[in-house]
Amino acid sequence: MSSIIGVVLAGGNSKRMGLDKAELPHPLNEQQTLLDHAMEILINCGCRKVVISGSKWDGIPDQFDDQGPMAGIYSVLDAIAESSFLFVPVDMPLLDPFLLQELVSASEVGTSVYFEDTRLPLLLRVNDSVKAYLSRVLSFDNEDQSLFSFYHAINALPIACSQPEKLININTPEDFQHLQVQQPLELEP
């Protein structure tokens, strides 16, 4: 695992939330922000280094404005010459290192891996065709910029998640409040 770079995707506009999601307190642990949580789980998963995709927090700014997570992924690949990255969204507070380890274990055959039925997290194995695809798609407005199309194009492997209920995104104040009022869950380190 020590060869994998962890990346927190935190470059979005948070329009539906109305506030920067990265700065929100974790709904089940107010001692840390959502950004702190995402960085912590990448570290606890064994990533060699953790970086932030986004213009704040000394992060890597998107080279393509308003293009979603694919712009963040491309910008990180362009800035850091490595072959393996583990991308997590900043707004997934129930995600834990054990789930990320499922992706790492499945990717040991050298392929990119994601959980079926959800766009992120993603264990991405990088080669020239991955970078070329992202550059082409982001450069033209008429291209399909969905992550699932990207995964299909690079032959990424979808795997089942052992705990899909932990793959919840917080996108609105209502999502955030709903998670806060649920019976507290015991989060794994």
Regions found by a protein language model. Give the residues of each.
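Short aromatic/hydrophobic "clamp" motif used to bind/position activated sugar donors
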Residues: F85-L86
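Short, glycine-/small-residue-rich phosphate/pyrophosphate-handling segment
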Residues: P121-I154
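Conserved donor-nucleotide/metal-binding helix-loop-beta segment in metal-dependent transferases, i.e.
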Residues: L95-R119
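Short beta-strand-to-loop element that shapes/binds the nucleotide-sugar donor at the catalytic cleft/hinge
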Residues: G54, S112-S129
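Conserved alpha/beta core of the MobA/IspD/sugar-nucleotide pyrophosphorylase nucleotidyltransferase superfamily
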Residues: E143-P189
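Active-site regions of enzymes building and remodeling cell-envelope glycoconjugates
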Residues: W57-D66, G110
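Glycine-rich, basic loop-to-helix element that forms the pyrophosphate-binding segment
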Residues: Q67-S75
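N-terminal glycine-rich phosphate-binding loop and ensuing alpha1 helix
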Residues: S2-S55, P97-L100
